[in-house]
From Swiss-Prot:
Entry EC number(s): 4.2.3.4
GN (gene name): aroB
Ubl conjugation listed as a keyword: no
Family: Belongs to the sugar phosphate cyclases superfamily. Dehydroquinate synthase family.
Record localization: Cytoplasm
Keyword field contains Zinc: yes
Protein's recorded name: 3-dehydroquinate synthase
Annotated positions binding Zn(2+): E184, H247, H263
Binding residues annotated for NAD(+), in chain numbering: G105, V106, V107, G108, D109, T129, T130, K142, K151, T169, I170, K171, T172
HAMAP family tied to this protein: DHQ_synthase
UniProt xrefs under Gene3D superfamilies: 3.40.50.1970, Dehydroquinate synthase-like - alpha domain
Length: 359
């Protein structure tokens, strides 16, 4: 098992990267205070991994119950959190108990928010089963739900006690889900590490063939890059905003399309959008934009959305959490592996780019 530590002083925690769940019980025992745990998962993941995880935990002497959510972003609501609260009370969870989030980013966000707010915070563990969650959402302590049509507008920063990644869980994902996860993977290379981009591009076939060595390297590298950023800026005051690369446009598309597209697909289109903004600002060349588009296409990701409602997406962008005084702040590329933050005052430029993405 590979271990990587996120160093946040008293909130530091390990990321454990394995090829099965055998060490999960040992990982939980390393910090547990009480004997009760609640495993939160969704209907899809429940069919594959819940029984195995619960058995490992029970053998370790942990009294574990289960709560199953409906899958998908459309169910990432306060109502889902209320359901978890009811189960927590029913199971008599207290401040020494543990919440385990077994699933993708939606499960992690909901379960983490419930853990952050129940009894003013109880321990929780992320057990991400999708490539997207393993690469991004399980690390860093962001939790929350959507509200009134706005993505992640209700939430909290709340760090897990541990992240346990079994890289082989992605074998049960549809190819489309794997590609969506690769949007967050390639994002890390685009913002900080050109060599990592080259590695992903070169090993794309091995990723889709579930090469364990490649998958473990991806998990370790993703956690290393994201972990470094989170360690420098836990609450997204400055540097951490670079992790939102492609997300300003991506989140707006995701919301306007009513979550018809996967998160990673929207991020991919958003990445092309920020490269186009940088191109029009003469920061980089059209050739580089096309190079990035070729990589995304190789990973099975969209680079445009024909028929995109430009006006609605443009208006939705202003709900982004980086907006200050009604001014749009973007994370833009300078080259592959380097980005910078920039306030865009030319709203027509944004509309021009959105129009490009709609063709």
């Amino acid at each position: 098992m590979i271990r990587h530590t996120i160093n946040l002083k008293e909130r530091s925690y390990p990321i454990c990267i394995a090829t099965d769940f055998q060490e999960l019980g040992k990982t939980v025992l390393s910090f547990r205070q009480g004997n009760k745990a609640l495993l939160i998962t969704d209907e899809n993941v429940d069919n594959y991994y819940s029984d195995e995880c619960m058995k490992v935990l029970q053998v370790s002497g942990i009294e574990v119950n289960k709560h199953v959510l409906k899958p998908g972003e459309s169910n990432k609501t306060l109502e889902a959190v209320y359901g978890i609260y009811n189960k927590m009370v029913e199971c008599k969870l207290d401040r020494s108990s543990i919440v385990l989030a077994l699933g993708g980013g939606v499960v992690g966000d909901i379960a983490g928010f419930a853990a952050a707010t129940y009894m003013r915070g109880i321990n929780f563990v992320q057990i991400p089963t999708t490539l997207l969650a393993q690469a991004d959402s399980s690390v860093g302590g962001k939790t929350g739900v959507d509200f009134n049509g706005h993505k992640n507008i209700v939430g909290a920063f709340y760090q897990p006690k541990a992240v346990f990644i079994n890289v082989n869980t992605i074998k049960t994902l549809p190819k489309r889900e794997i590609s969506a996860g690769l949007a967050e993977v390639i994002k890390h290379g685009l913002i900080m590490d050109e060599e990592y981009c080259d590695y992903i591009n070169y090993n794309a076939d091995k990723i889709f063939k579930f090469d364990e060595n490649v998958l473990q390297y991806l998990a370790k590298k993703n956690c290393s890059i994201k972990g470094y950023v989170v360690e420098q800026d836990e609450k997204e005051d400055d540097l951490r905003a670079i992790l939102n690369f492609g997300h300003t446009i991506g989140h707006a598309i995701e919301t306007v399309e009513n979550f018809r597209l996967l998160h990673g697909e929207c991020v991919s289109i958003g990445i092309v959008g920020v490269y186009k903004i940088a191109q029009y600002m003469e920061v980089l060349s059209e050739q580089l934009v096309n190079q990035v588009k070729e990589i995304l296409l190789k990973l099975g990701l969209p680079v445009s959305l024909p028929g995109l409602d430009v006006e609605r997406v443009y208006n939705q962008i202003f709900y982004d959490k980086k907006v200050k005084d009604n001014k749009l702040k973007f994370v833009l590329p300078r080259r592959i592996g380097e980005v910078f933050q920039c306030t865009i005052k030319d709203n027509e430029l944004i509309k021009k780019v959105l129009l490009d993405l709609s063709n």
